[in-house]
Amino acid sequence: TVQWLNRQTVDVAEQRLWDIMVHNIAAYKKLIEYVGSLPPQLRMVRLGSDVLPVYTQRDWAYYWQQPDVVAYCQREFAKVGDTARLLDVRLSMHPGQFTVLASDNPEIVDRSIEEFEYHTDVIRYMGYGKQFQDFKCNVHISGRNGPAGIKAALKRLSPEARNVITIENDENKWGIADSLELADDLALVLDVHHHWCREGEYIQPSDDRYKRIVDSWRGVRPAMHYSYSRDTALPEGFAHDSMLDFPD
């Protein structure tokens, strides 16, 4: 993406970014309208992260701060958020694997905070982040510093980012017990499959750990993940991410 932009004149590159922005925001709205037509219990959707490409890239971050671009994002993302609220569609985002807030490398933490705040800007444009867990932006603990690293990073996040961040247990180093160290700081997402892969058990609703996870949501209806790796579970013609991208 960056290499393609750098090969173009500024006018061509900026026009391409504009076209992608227009397409991707419209795709968000269309997706939410579809999900809003489903039965109430299915009205939830994870939004793709690439809606505004190169947002945190040093050479191109300026583009997203230009007044006309900001004005378009404010106006059009607001329509997306209004649609979701009107149709009672619960929204979430999940920054990628390179968002490692608990890294022991300060530069990686800095970049991870930038990436999380990019997601928060999109969330803020849609009218969320105003209160605790009106939107879910989920990350794994990751990183060698574990729960302590997450707590340190939380202090550096914007109020809106702290309102929307959730932590999910994973199937490798950081499980439910580690997530629960953060239960007083943020909402926890239980991934049943990750827990099964790591511990070889399915957690039961009667389990005290389950209750503590629910309590971390402070009265908000909790979100939960049940992941699996079978690609054929997706209907034909659907993909995880249909955001517009750059040519080769």
Regions found by a protein language model. Name each.
Residues 1-90, 99-102, 107-112, 121, ...:
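Alpha/beta catalytic barrel-like cores
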Residues 109-187, 193:
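Eukaryote-skewed repeat-based solenoidal scaffolds used as protein-protein interaction platforms
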Residues 196-200:
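Short active-site loop/helix that positions an aromatic residue
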Residues 94, 191:
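Conserved, mostly hydrophobic/aromatic
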